[in-house]
Amino acid sequence: MSAMPDHWIKEKALKEGMISPFVDHKEEAGVLSYGLSSYGYDARVDSKFKIFANTHSSIVDPKNFPQDSFIDKETDVCIMPPNSFMLAKTVEYFRIPKDVIVICVGKSTYARCGIVVSVTPLEPGWEGYVTLEFSNTAPLPVKVYAFEGACQFIFLAGNERCSISYDQVNGKYMRQGGVTLPIVS
């Protein structure tokens, strides 16, 4: 497997719609950077956030997820409480080629403030908006800026195509249009 360079990412985005909307350069003036980088793509976070709130003393069960465990906020600046967790989605829609798997890493600017951004791999053949998981490990509130960079996606090309891709197994998170809560089917 090899990490794919900027020119490969740009070609796939423009010719095959791998990333849409696609920013073909690194935008960084006065914002948390986003767009194309040397060996990845820095994606933006949308303005709709779901912040965990223990208002009902619920237990989080991934098989029976309590929908009322979140407070929904739509804002350009979301203030994450200390030691909290929230979900959001990318501004960009991704279409992953069948010979590629994508991993996500956080941005150093947020990491230095105590924010960890986590995403499970984007499987070959998957498409949709990516649900982002934010953890505030800091003992203080931290601002998260909508429409600015939140994480970097690294595209790893396999030596050959996989036998069964995510779209072929009707994956439960295929074509998700917004923040998607856990699904156990």
Curated annotation (Swiss-Prot):
Reactions that this protein is recorded to catalyse: dCTP + H2O + H(+) = dUTP + NH4(+)
Pathway assigned to this chain's UniProt record: Pyrimidine metabolism; dUMP biosynthesis; dUMP from dCTP (dUTP route): step 1/2
UniProt entry keywords in alphabetical sequence: Hydrolase, Nucleotide metabolism, Nucleotide-binding
BP GO terms, sorted: dUMP biosynthetic process; dUTP biosynthetic process
SUPFAM superfamilies per UniProt: dUTPase-like (SSF51283)
InterPro entries registered for this protein in UniProt: dCTP_deaminase (IPR011962), dUTPase-like_sf (IPR036157), dUTPase_trimeric (IPR033704)
Pfam family, one: DCD
Catalytic site: E133
EC nos: 3.5.4.13
UniProt superkingdom: Bacteria
MF-aspect GO terms: dCTP deaminase activity; nucleotide binding
Binding of dCTP, residues: K107, S108, T109, Y110, A111, R112, T131, L132, E133, Q152, Y166, Q176
Enzyme kind, highest EC tier: hydrolase
Function: Catalyzes the deamination of dCTP to dUTP.
Family membership noted in the UniProt record: Belongs to the dCTP deaminase family.
Assembly and interaction partners: Homotrimer.
NCBIfam families, per the entry: dCTP_deam
Stated name of the protein: dCTP deaminase
Organism (species): Anaplasma marginale (strain Florida)
Gene name linked to the record: dcd
